[in-house]
């Protein structure tokens, strides 16, 4: 507090502090389709943000994720749908701003139940990668249903096998790191069964 308010480490932005409850538990990412009325939840996923193994090092945008998340039971799933996702969509509709598209909720599963950390109007990264490789449903009709308001006519089908996404980042990430280094071994990785290579922040020459 002294660093922020007395030493002015954040300038004028540090003149006011908001103190909130520290939530303990496991984080889980819940993604859903919405057509403004209906909410269709995707399967669960958990990402890991710490840069190093053992949940150590600085936080990142995500060093990996897996789906499904064993901690996210069917009972929890129904509770999240009924008490968090649906009320949000209904409230936006009542305000004349119906939400159509992807909803991404970051939740903390506490001893007192799921608590909302954040909402995003987008897919989660890297949670989406293991989710989409497990999804058997065609995603295009789902997007169309979000637009047309016919999401209640759809169900999602999933592969039973779990999926894991591992992020390969440059040394030094999320701090300063060298750019332009060649990435090798991708052809060999693609040749492995059940392996998909996704790109982010890369280019080909």
Label the model's feature ranges.
Residues 81-103, 120-192, 199-204:
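Active-site "cap" helix and flanking loop/linker of ATP-utilizing ligase/carboxylase catalytic domains
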Residues 1-130:
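Internal nucleotide-binding/catalytic subdomain
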Residues 16, 41, 163-165, 194:
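A residue-level signal for beta-strand positions that form part of recognition/binding surfaces
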């Amino acid at each position: 507090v002294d660093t922020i308010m007395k030493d002015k480490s954040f300038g004028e932005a540090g003149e006011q502090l908001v103190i909130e409850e520290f939530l303990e538990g496991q984080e889980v990412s819940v993604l859903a389709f919405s057509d403004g009325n209906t909410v269709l939840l995707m399967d669960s996923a958990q990402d890991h943000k710490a840069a190093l193994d053992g949940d150590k090092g600085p936080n990142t945008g995500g060093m990996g994720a897996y789906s499904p998340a064993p901690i996210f039971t069917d009972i929890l799933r129904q509770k999240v749908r009924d008490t968090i996702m649906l009320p949000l969509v209904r409230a936006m509709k009542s305000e004349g701003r119906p939400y159509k598209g992807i909803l991404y909720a970051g939740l903390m599963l506490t001893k007192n139940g799921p608590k909302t950390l954040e909402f995003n109007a987008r897919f989660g990264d890297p949670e989406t990668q293991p989710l989409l490789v497990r999804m058997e449903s065609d995603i295009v009709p789902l997007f169309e249903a979000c637009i047309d308001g016919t999401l209640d006519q759809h169900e999602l089908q999933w592969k039973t096998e779990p999926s894991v996404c591992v992020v390969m980042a440059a040394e030094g990430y999320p701090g300063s790191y060298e750019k332009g280094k060649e990435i090798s071994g991708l052809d060999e990785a693609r040749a492995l069964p059940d392996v998909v290579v996704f790109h982010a922040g890369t280019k080909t020459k």
